[in-house]
Design a protein with these regions (language model features):
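N-terminal low-structure segments adjacent to metalloprotease catalytic domains
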Residues: 1-28
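Juxtacatalytic substrate-recognition/specificity segment
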Residues: 31-163, 170, 174, 180-184, ...
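Active-site rim elements
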Residues: 59, 203-211, 222, 234-237, ...
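Active-site-proximal structural scaffolding
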Residues: 65, 164-167, 213-217, 229, ...
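Alpha-helical scaffold elements that line and support the substrate/ligand-binding pocket
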Residues: 145-154, 171, 213-233
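Catalytic-site signature segments of enzymes, centered on catalytic residues
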Residues: 155, 190-217
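Short helix/loop segments within enzyme catalytic domains
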Residues: 178-201, 229-241
Length: 278
């Protein structure tokens, strides 16, 4: 059985208090997931809040089992199973994060501590406590789960590491693929479009980890899928190449005789005239 209270290494750059380690309590176990919540935060919730959180995690567990896991693995490939911890369940650690963060993924966790000293030695993702009863929680889980698929498909199977912009582009597209952006108001997509419009001249492939970066890669992924189908994201993920070269290979696989720079230029023009029929 999984331990009730566990000490986890966390990313101080995302943590609300810049901590590197926290104690977390196991709140829920499903067939697929362990939900751990930062102990001090959980203990400070009143019983009604704790009840609301338990209900939210029940719903999220069902959504993961019935939709997120099957849709994303069938489109993009498998995660490491049973992986570094020998357990088919994925750990979801919920802790207090800075306000602009919904979650994160640490690829080091899938390696042993000999290879990655701060590894938690689990297949796991991190979600913000601030999102836990929000409609954006499922989008955040889908996004981070795609990073777990990516580390398996690229780093573990192909022995290459994806470029950040394309890794984020695929993860950003997942809420749309799952139908979570269908109601545009309050969606991840709406947030990203606003961020992009704040800084529409941002580079697509030079990653600075700003909201505008996420906006740019989200819109580029939307454009790619609108024109070439979700296979363009999947084929480039399963390629031994990374970044631009993997997108070009995926285009060629479909018989599209265009370079990345041509596709990029067409996207830029479509943005300029705001006509996605182009």
């Amino acid at each position: 059985a999984a331990s009730q209270t566990v000490s986890f290494n966390i990313d101080s750059s995302y943590d609300l208090f810049s901590r590197q380690e926290i104690e977390a309590e196991l709140i829920r176990t499903t067939q697929d997931l362990y939900f751990y919540i930062e102990k001090s935060w959980w203990d400070s919730r009143n019983s009604q809040e704790q009840n609301d959180i338990r209900l939210a995690l029940f719903d999220l567990g069902e959504e993961f089992r019935n939709k997120i896991y099957p849709v994303l693995t069938s489109n993009f490939g498998s995660i490491p199973e049973p992986g570094i911890d020998g357990d088919q369940r994925i750990t979801v650690l919920i802790h207090q994060m800075r306000q602009d963060a919904g979650g994160y993924f640490n690829s080091g966790d899938v390696y042993s501590r000999l290879q990655a000293p701060r590894s938690n030695e689990r297949e796991m993702v991190y979600l913000s406590a601030g999102y836990v009863t929000s409609s954006k929680l499922r989008s955040a889980l889908a996004h981070e789960f795609l990073h777990l698929i990516t580390v398996n498909q690229k780093d573990l199977l192909q022995k290459v590491t994806e470029e950040v912009w394309l890794n984020e582009a695929r993860a950003e597209y997942t809420p749309t693929l799952l139908g979570y952006d269908d109601a545009y108001a309050g969606s991840n997509l709406e947030t990203r479009v606003r961020a992009f419009l704040d800084n529409p001249t941002i580079s697509l492939t030079e990653w600075l980890n700003s909201g505008s970066d996420y906006g740019a890669v989200n819109l580029f992924a939307q454009y790619l899928v609108d024109h070439y189908g979700v296979r363009i994201l999947a084929d480039s993920l399963q390629s031994s190449k990374v970044g631009i070269a993997s997108v070009e290979e995926a285009l060629q696989k479909q018989g599209v005789k265009k370079s990345f720079s041509q596709v990029f230029a067409e996207w830029a023009i479509a943005l300029l005239v705001n006509d996605c029929r182009l």
